[in-house]
């Protein structure tokens, strides 16, 4: 008798969706959208040591994080044009593209939708302007030594891009940080 009851209880439990599958189904019902952004690893050609421009800003959870300058493409804009514009808006630096680096592709959930985001990154060189985080999107913009920049970056994908850029620029990997 006990075996039958426990078997019935097991079947009953297994026929009920788990909280994980409920969450997955709820997530699948959210509408999706595609977003495309661009930015770059901006190199300071005049510094005593190789330096890159980093910005600090608040993420979706309100935490202060450091990242590479980047932002959404505007209507009719190429990824390269958007990268140059976003770098100037977020850092005050006038930059030119040296090389296309890589794209990062990921998903996240925001405001009742799932977002598929692609971010195109470029290696860029500062050719003018003055670094400043004086705008409403960025808390701070700073030149950071290339060898120390990866330790500041909040996102693993950006750390990988920085290591790749360093190998391309200097022929060696970044120091652990």
Each language-model region and where it sits:
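Charged phosphate-binding loop/patch that engages nucleotide di/tri-phosphates or the phosphate backbone
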Residues: 21-23, 156-177
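N-terminal strand-loop-strand
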Residues: 3-4, 8-68
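Short, charged/polar low-complexity linear motifs in solvent-exposed/disordered segments
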Residues: 67-70, 114, 150, 168-171
